[in-house]
Each structure stands twice: as structure tokens, then as C-alpha cells.
Swiss-Prot record:
Coiled coil: none annotated. This is Mono-ADP-ribosyltransferase C3. The record marks 213 as: Transition state stabilizer. Monomer. Keywords: Glycosyltransferase, NAD, Nucleotidyltransferase, Secreted, Signal, Transferase. The keyword Magnesium does not apply. GO terms for cellular component: extracellular region. Gene3D superfamilies: Toxin ADP-ribosyltransferase, Chain A, domain 1. To exoenzymes 3 of C.limosum and C.botulinum D phage, and to S.aureus ediN.
Amino acid sequence: MKGIRKSILCLVLSAGVIAPVTTSIVQSPQKCYACTVDKGSYADTFTEFTNVEEAKKWGNAQYKKYGLSKPEQEAIKFYTRDASKINGPLRANQGNENGLPADILQKVKLIDQSFSKMKMPQNIILFRGDDPAYLGPEFQDKILNKDGTINKTVFEQVKAKFLKKDRTEYGYISTSLMSAQFGGRPIVTKFKVTNGSKGGYIDPISYFPGQLEVLLPRNNSYYISDMQISPNNRQIMITAMIFK
């Protein structure tokens, strides 16, 4: 099909198994932790959209199936306006609801509830852009050279810490169906999300429509299988698998 690319993924998974800059999709999660995982083999085919209209058509078709309530829609729209108002407290509490402000807790419960209706109908590739803060205080001020290129020495240190390990995001994960949304971001993650995983296309109710946004649940873990520097030396390209 025009505008859609099929990608073959071969990586290893666990056997047991961000504050935005201008919009909710660009996140810098600082309450994520990396740890070594047990590895088992995994291989499958994933759909990647390369055409905006194809992506919109697919996404809108999915959204019509959800049947979200008005309160659920409003909670998601609130999140997309400024994700830090929800993700900030969640990350600070490492995903624990205790201690959240009452108004935020109410929205968290509504968003959580919405994921009972939103699931991926097929294996799919999603993208997220991040600022250097994604790498944590150890690297965020050192990963970029003054000219905006990636510091290769620091990048090797980053790889040693995160590559071939899993990572947990305590906030919700905002992604896009297409990588073009993040051309100016220094870090771009390519997520492999499997059929049946919780997640939904929310662009029709986003405060910033047009970003082809797909929202994934909080307390999600993912395995970082690859980290590379882009050919122009201005982006770190991460490949990761979301755990169900």
C-alpha cells in the first residue's frame, strides 16, 4: 500500500514479559530508570506510515471505534495541552497515585479508564521526540556540542548506560504515527508496539491537532535495542520495543 512501509524487527525482550517543550508529544522524562533485562528472541513485521494522509485515514478509523465518553475526551485534551501537569506529578511519585492533587488524580483515572477502549489493532511503529533531558542530568548538558551536533564521546557513555536495557516511563507516553514531527529534536525514539497493546490515536481530540498523536499508557516499560547517531550527526536515533 502506498505510504506504508513494512519493517522486519529482530530483537530481544525481557523474558518476563517527559516535560514537553511546546506540545505533549515532545517529552523529556527524567523519572525513568534503566536496568538489565533477561533476553528472549522476538521477530515480527511492523507497519510504518510514510504518508500523512494514509496515517490520518488509519488513525481516524481507529478513533471512531473507541467510543470515548465526554469526560474521557476532556481529560485527554487537558493532557495534550500541557502534559507536564499530569506527567510531572506521576514521575515525581514514580507512578504512584498517592499524593496526587485531587484534580490531577481525577484526570489520571479517566485517562487510565480510556485505555480499556483503546488498543493497537496491529503491530505498528510509533515515534517520539525528546530533548537532552531525556538522558538525565548526567548527560543532558554534555550530549550536544556547541554547534548542535552529537558529542560522540558522550554518546558512547550514553550507550553504555541505556543500550540493551529496559526503561520505565511513569508518565503517559505521547507519540506520533510519523517521524517527520520530530525533525528538529536531538533524540528520536522509534517504538515497536505490538498488536493488542494498549494505546490510542487521539489526534481528533488533541489540543494540538495535526500531530498524528498516539497516546500510550503510563507505567510502561520498553527495551532499547539500538542507539545510533543520524548521518547528519544531529540526532540520536533510538529503537525500542514497548512491553505489553
